[in-house]
């Protein structure tokens, strides 16, 4: 296997790792039920997406 000829500096290592952060997903409030869901996805509570029923959900009795 290949081995590095020179040690990488702390600055170069830090510059490479600048994009490796954890990002919080953007959330939106469902206008139908008021629950929070990720943008551009179906609401997990009611099954609606953009005002239309996308997934048939069973109502708990």
Swiss-Prot record:
Family label: Belongs to the bacterial ribosomal protein bL32 family.
Domain of life: Bacteria
UniProt GO molecular function: structural constituent of ribosome
Single GO cellular component term: large ribosomal subunit
One of the protein's GO biological processes: translation
Region of interest called Disordered, as start-end residue ranges on this chain: 1-20
Annotated organism of origin: Porphyromonas gingivalis (strain ATCC BAA-308 / W83)
Residue ranges with Basic residues bias: 1-19
NCBIfam families: rpmF_bact
UniProt cross-references to SUPFAM superfamilies, sorted A to Z: Zn-binding ribosomal proteins
Gene name as annotated: rpmF
Protein name in UniProt: Large ribosomal subunit protein bL32
Keyword terms of this UniProt record: Ribonucleoprotein, Ribosomal protein
UniProt cross-references to Pfam families, sorted A to Z: Ribosomal_L32p
PANTHER family linked to this entry: 50S RIBOSOMAL PROTEIN L32, LARGE RIBOSOMAL SUBUNIT PROTEIN BL32
């Amino acid at each position: 296997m290949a081995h590095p000829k020179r040690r990488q500096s702390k600055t170069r290592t830090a510059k490479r790792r600048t994009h490796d952060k954890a990002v919080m997903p953007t959330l939106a409030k469902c206008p139908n039920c008021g629950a929070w869901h990720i943008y551009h996805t179906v609401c997990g509570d009611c099954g609606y997406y953009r005002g239309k029923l996308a997934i048939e959900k069973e109502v708990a009795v």
